[in-house]
Every structure is written in C-alpha cells, then in structure tokens.
A protein has these predicted regions:
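PAS-family sensory modules
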Residues: 1-34, 119, 123-144
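PAS-family sensory domains
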Residues: 2, 51-126
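A general structural signal for short secondary-structure boundary/capping elements
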Residues: 41, 110-114, 141-144
C-alpha cells in the first residue's frame, strides 16, 4: 500500500493498514488487530491516547498491555490470549477486565475479538473492538 512502510514481521497488518485507518475514523469503540504469526499489533489512535500506548505497529503490545491490566484480572487476560495465539481458537468469548488509563485510574473494558484463518485453517489475524463499561451496573463484580 502506498505511503506505508513496514518490516516483513508486520505482514498482514501493513497490508490492512489503510482499511484499519479508515475504520478507526468511523468507529467510536477502540479497535485493535494482531498478526498471529509475528505477534505484532496495531491499536486505534483513541486507544493509544486514552491508555498511553505506543502508536503505530507495536512488536511487544501484548506484554505491554498486560502490564496495564489490573492484577486481579491478568489471569483471565492471559487465558484469553493463550486461547487465541497459542491454541488458535477462533470461538473465544468476550472478556471483561480493568485497565489502567493514562491518568492512573482503572476502567472496565469489554473486549470482543475474532480470528481470521487462512485456507488451511491457521489463524493469521486477530482483530476486534474494546468498549468502556461506564455504568457499574453493566459489570457483574463477582464473575467479571
């Protein structure tokens, strides 16, 4: 795609970047995409701004993001990431967890993602949206 320079590790993200940029301009939710082979990720500008994240394609986003997740919610996050990136599951349920925002307060997010597979059934792209859960009544504090 013209105007986008990428390393070979960025693969599918670089190819999808113009579409990703268009979507982030029209979506009020936070969006993300992860190349399942290279583990490179890209997040929307709004997500990067609200949570002090690196902009552009990041090579260690998954670990960086985990560091922002509330300690009580990290295991649930790890299990979700393992289901997608290690086990290659495409039927993952939505996950709700707390993340430390730019100003230091924790906010509840609901993450919904799906896996795109190649012709041989191998996962190549994990993409989705995250939404803030503003009202306390939206989250069951016992089950998350």
């Amino acid at each position: 795609m013209e105007g986008y320079k990428s390393s070979p590790a960025e693969g599918i993200l670089a190819k999808s970047r113009p579409l990703f940029d268009l979507l982030q301009q029209t979506c009020s939710q936070y969006i993300f995409a992860c190349d399942m082979q290279s583990r490179c990720c890209i997040v929307s500008e709004k997500l990067a701004e609200d949570f002090a994240l690196p902009r552009g394609i990041s090579h260690d986003f998954i670990n960086f993001w985990e560091g922002l997740i509330h300690p009580e919610d990290r295991q649930r996050y790890r299990e979700s990431i393992k289901a997608v990136l290690v086990e290659g599951r495409s039927d993952i349920p939505d996950i709700v967890y707390r993340v430390k925002a730019r100003r230091g307060e924790y906010v509840w997010l609901q993450c919904s993602g799906r896996v795109r597979c190649n012709k041989s059934g191998q996962g190549v792209l994990f993409a989705g949206v995250m939404s803030k859960l503003v009202q306390k009544g939206k989250v069951d504090m016992l089950t998350g």
